[in-house]
From Swiss-Prot:
The lineage of its organism: Bacteria, Pseudomonadati, Pseudomonadota, Alphaproteobacteria, Acetobacterales. This is GTPase Obg. GTP binds at residues 166-173, 191-195, 213-216, 280-283, 309-311. InterPro entries: G_OBG, GTP-bd, GTP-bd_Obg/CgtA, GTP1-OBG_CS, GTP1_OBG_dom, GTP1_OBG_dom_sf, OBG_GTPase, P-loop_NTPase. The gene is obg. Its cofactor is Mg(2+). An essential GTPase which binds GTP, GDP and possibly (p)ppGpp with moderate affinity, with high nucleotide exchange rates and a fairly low GTP hydrolysis rate. Plays a role in control of the cell cycle, stress response, ribosome biogenesis and in those bacteria that undergo differentiation, in morphogenesis control. GO terms for biological process: ribosome biogenesis. It comes from Gluconacetobacter diazotrophicus (strain ATCC 49037 / DSM 5601 / CCUG 37298 / CIP 103539 / LMG 7603 / PAl5). One of its GO terms (molecular function) is GTPase activity.
Length: 350
């Protein structure tokens, strides 16, 4: 399935139904009076976060969504039928922006979360509504109120516990394919991964986390160079970053600093996220190279550095356990800090 993380669409809620002019007509009742009913309410445009979706690709082919008009009123004071809402399902983590691409209207960050983005128009009033002591037979009825319409941008920020970052060819796709059931494209050239990939890592029945392989970042990624500007946003929701450094490529300190600079320059608080630095591809290095490059990384970063090999699976279990512990701690801290929330499926309004 193709990946698409942003889309522009048009949405319009339904117009309200029209009120009608009608009079009571029964045998032996010469002047029955007005009994025209009101129009029904137009359909709403509702967005819902669906846990089984992970791309906005469907919106490439369907870009216009319109709800139906409410039913017209009828005699005998009958109100027109309300139109059904149009439910638009999007992946969890989708943000809805106004046409200016800056004003956020909604953030659907929980499965089942809903928002009414455009409210249907109210129905027009029938002539029964306008009856007064001085106007016993009004012939006035209102048209339904128009619905709301707007162009909006959908922007998907994947929700993963761990974000894999590193320069192109750092071994991120290989790592993801080995530790999870994900099958990203793997080859020995830069930018093999053109779209974010998700995988689920299960250490036990009760322990699992979602890991995202973010396409390779390069110098200037935060300004749009390479593929990074588009995909740095996917890292924002991760609890911890696993920074893979290609140990066989040479200058490991420069590689680490390049990515750190891009994370710090991006305005999503990425630099403050917990980071685990891993010296990758130790199967292609001598013990002396592993030791010297590990020490150089630790000196430059001021942090402990783990070593691993995605190809030979060396030290993978230790790294996964470290990631799981960090993710668990972050989840517990977030749970303690979060205020009580209503059950999923609640509706909000934009």
């Amino acid at each position: 399935m193709k990946f698409l993380d942003q889309a522009k669409i048009y949405v319009k809620s339904g117009d309200g139904g029209d009120g009608v002019v009608a009079f009571r007509r029964e045998k032996y009742i010469e002047f029955g009076g007005p009994d025209g009913g009101n129009g029904g309410r137009g359909g709403d445009i509702v967005f819902e976060a669906a846990g089984n979706l992970n791309t906005l690709i469907d919106f490439r082919y369907t870009q216009h969504f319109r709800a139906r008009k409410g039913g017209n009123g009828a005699g005998s004071d009958r109100t027109g039928a309300a139109a059904a809402p149009v439910l638009i399902q999007v992946p969890v983590g989708t943000q809805i922006f106004d046409e200016d691409r800056e004003t956020m209207l909604a953030d659907l960050d929980q499965p089942g979360k809903r928002i009414v983005l455009c409210h249907g128009g109210d129905g027009g009033r029938g002539n029964a509504h306008f009856k007064t002591s001085t106007n016993r037979a009004p012939r006035r009825a209102d048209k339904g109120w128009p619905g709301e319409e707007r162009w909006i941008w959908l922007r998907l920020k994947l929700i993963a516990d761990v974000g894999l970052v590193g320069l192109p060819n750092a071994g991120k796709s290989t790592f993801l394919s080995v530790v999870s059931a994900a099958r990203p494209k793997i080859a020995d050239y830069p930018f093999t991964t053109l779209h974010p990939q998700l995988g689920v890592v299960r250490l036990s029945v009760a322990e699992e986390f979602v890991i995202a392989d973010i396409p390779g970042l390069i110098e200037g990624a935060h300004e749009g160079a390479g593929l990074g500007d588009r995909f740095l946003g996917h890292v924002e929701r991760c609890a911890v970053l696993l920074h893979l450094v290609d140990g066989a490529a040479g200058d490991v300190v420069k590689a680490w600093r390049t990515i750190r600079h891009e994370l710090e320059a991006y305005d999503g608080g990425l630099a403050a996220k917990p980071e685990i630095i891993a010296l990758n591809k130790i199967d292609a290095m001598t013990p002396q190279q592993i030791s010297s490059r590990r020490r150089a990384l630790e000196k430059a970063s001021g942090m402990p550095v783990v070593t691993l090999s995605g190809v030979t699976r060396q030290n993978l279990d230790d790294v996964l356990r470290l990631l799981q512990d960090r993710v668990t701690a972050t989840r517990e801290a977030a749970r303690d800090a979060a205020p009580p929330q209503a059950a999923a499926g609640r509706e909000e309004t934009a």
